[in-house]
Structure formats: C-alpha cells, structure tokens
Amino acid sequence: MFGSDHTLAVIYIDGLVDTLTINHSIMQSLTSKDYDEELHTSDPAEILSIIKNRFLSIGSISDLEHMEPLISAILEGNTVILIDGSSHGVIASSIGGEERGVEEPQSQTVVRGPKEGFTENIRTNTALIRRKIKSPNLWIVDRKIGRVTQTDVAVMYLNGIANDKIVQEILNRLDRIDTDSILESGYIEEFIQDTTFTPFPTITNTERPDAIAGAILEGKIAILVDGTPFALIAPITIFKLFQSSEDYYQKFDIATFLRLLRIISFVVSMLLPSLYIAISTFHQEMLPTTLLISLAAQREGIPFPAVVEALAMEITFEVLREAGVRMPRAMGSAISIVGALVLGQAAVQAGLVSAAMVIIVAFTAIASFVAPSVSIANSARLLRFGFMILAATLGLFGIMAGLLAMLIHLAGLRSFGLPYLTPFAPFIPLDQKDVLVRVPWWAMVTRPTLINRKNAKRQKMNQRPSPSDGNK
C-alpha cells in the first residue's frame, strides 16, 4: 500500500539486484511514513510521477510507458514500480548481485605495469577504461545481441581519432548478427572477422584494461561483451600479436630485444621439428660429420622414421598440455611437468624415440609459450603439423613451398580493410618506429597512419631529452 488508497507493486529478481539499494532507496522511501498529506491527486499516473521525482533517491530512474520493456528491464537487474489503475510504471536502476572483483589477469602477465584485469561485468570494464582515458571523446556505443540471452555489447573508440568507416563497419557487422545466444566474446569474433578459414587471428583479445586503452589511443576499436573478461581489439596486424603492453613501460632497447625474441621463438616453434625431419631424412650432408654420427648413433634401433617419431612426441605433448589446462590448478602443473619428464625418459630408454627428438620437441614447446598472444601461439601449433608433413615428403623444398604459400596467404588477409602485413606490405616508412623495433617515446610522434588519416599526430616534436647546462 502507498498512502491509504493506492496499491504499489515493486518487482525485481533476487540475486540480480543490489539489496542495499532496494531496501534503503526504494522500500524505505515508500514505506517509512504516511504520504496521504503529500499526495494532492488520486490519478495513478500523477502519483507515479510524484514517486519518481520526490520519493525515490536513486541516480537512474526512467519512465515505463508500455509493458514491452518490463521483462527485459527486470531481467537486467532493474526494479520496476507499478501502481494499480495505470498502464505506466517506473524503472529504477538497482543492478547488482554477486560478481568477481578486479584482480590481476591470469593471462598476459607483466613484471612492470598495472596489475588490474577485466571482470565479467561490462560496466566495471568500461569504467576501468574510462579511468585511464578521461576524455569526453571516448564514445561507447551499446548493443544487445542474442534473441534469448540479450547480451550487452559495448563498442568503445575515440571520436576524432578512430576511423569512422571502420567504426561503422564494425557496428554494421554486429547488427547483422542474428543468433539465440552470445555467451563470450569468442562468439562475436567468429561472426565479424574478415576471414574464417585462416589459422591467423584477424581480431585479438585481451583482459588487460591498459592494453585496451593503448589500442584505443592508437585509433583502434574495442569490443566489450558482458559476461567475459576478454575484450576484442580491431583492426590489427600480425606484428601487434608479438607486442606486449609491458613493451611500452620499459626502455626501448629492451622492448625491441624482446619483440625480436618473440618473433624468433614463433618461427622456432613453427619450424624446428620440420627442419629436423627434413635434414635428418633428406639433407644429411648439411650436418657436420660429428653431429651426423651422434644423431645416427641415437637413432640406431629406433623402429620409426623421424616423421612418425616427431608426430608421436608432438601429439603426446599436446595431450599433456590439454590435460594440464583442464585439470584442477593444483594438479595441472604437476601432471604437465611429471608427465613430460616420465614419458620422455621412458620413451628414450625403451628405444622408441631418440634423445635428440625429445630435446627438439621440448624446446619447441618452450618457444611456443613466449608469444604474448595465445591466438598467435595456437597458429604456430596448427602450422607445425603441416610443415612436418611437408618436410617428410619434400624435405627443405617442401618447407620453402609452405613458407611461400603462408606468405601469400598473409599478404591477402585483411582486418576490417587493414592489410595484415602493414606497415611492410604496403610499406609505410613512417610506421616502422613501433613494429619490430620500438623507438623511444619522444620519437613516436604519430599514430599508425594507415588507420588514422585525419588525426595521426600523437604528440609534438622535438621532445628528445638533453642534459641541462649547469653553467647557465
């Protein structure tokens, strides 16, 4: 009852709302005293207006003019207030419920840099980005995708810096999605990516707010999805997949060294087993005599050819890696380490594989973990098996043919219109300062020019530090 003659209905779903807001800002305001003296009308619509403007102490209140949005508003965690005799209502924001706090990201860890990571709450995530980019030009475009789940999706970009055509293309692709459910950002990624049948990612993901902020400041667009800590970044080039946010927090020479190390490790993880197969099977003359004799002695008594040996070891390691990921955390690392040691040693002693092959597979596995992006590391895992088959059939000529085909494929990839090998194909000298090599911050005057044609300048020139003249 509200007053003496009016019946109110306060509707919400327990578990989706903030109970403190319900109790103190809604229920207490409506039931703490008799409002008959303050109501000068008996019209239900006017009473709702009085309740909205005078009695509710909540920051976000809106009118419910028809019943269609009622269910969706309640399911989002809002509270709906209805009064007997009126077809209108009031929607009071009371979104709450249990959620995980801001913690250090489980992936893409850094030694130096912010330790905060995204959560499963999209509003918490957008707030984390706004805390880093305090600009009114940081725009957020909201969408609801999924006929059943009605998942909140937020597209974030800097107006005036991001390419308007790319922003509109992303929004158009999001609007074309017609499916029952969106439970994670991976759904969105597969629906909007340029090319489906490629092992290389054309959209990257991260759970680091600083990585999203840095990408937005370069003119890229971020896509956040409610219910997951992983946000998407587009457009990207392949070289961005080898860069870590920590590269920008330490000296440029160390960052450059680490970038080159990651690229070399990617090539090693992709090609090392196939090179071993090709050389040991077809091109033994390329090895020094001492090394060749050592490898031949190790392979004496091995019943399998090198390609079968390598495939068996690689598949075994993939099984161990997957088991380590799926097992409880306390047991996963132990299974991976102990399983690899025990199986490797037992296989060598049983004469099933050579010691050299165990070393090759182990070093390949270690190199695959160097890449900061899980997506590009997974690409190397898939391509590794293809190159091993080429090496077993055609030797080094097969590996070179595979590399040429891969290069042609990379040259044809696009990420929302951006060539995947930018700034090398097409070659843009001005953008070389933050690709393989990272120059000092005072030298990075412009943003990537192919993305930012209208506002490419990042900072003023001539900021190189110099020692002061103490005699003046």
What residue spans do the PLM features occupy?
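Generic detector of multi-pass transmembrane helix bundles and their immediately adjacent loops
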Residues: 275-278, 288-472
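Membrane-embedded alpha-helical signal segments
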Residues: 1-271, 285, 289, 409-472
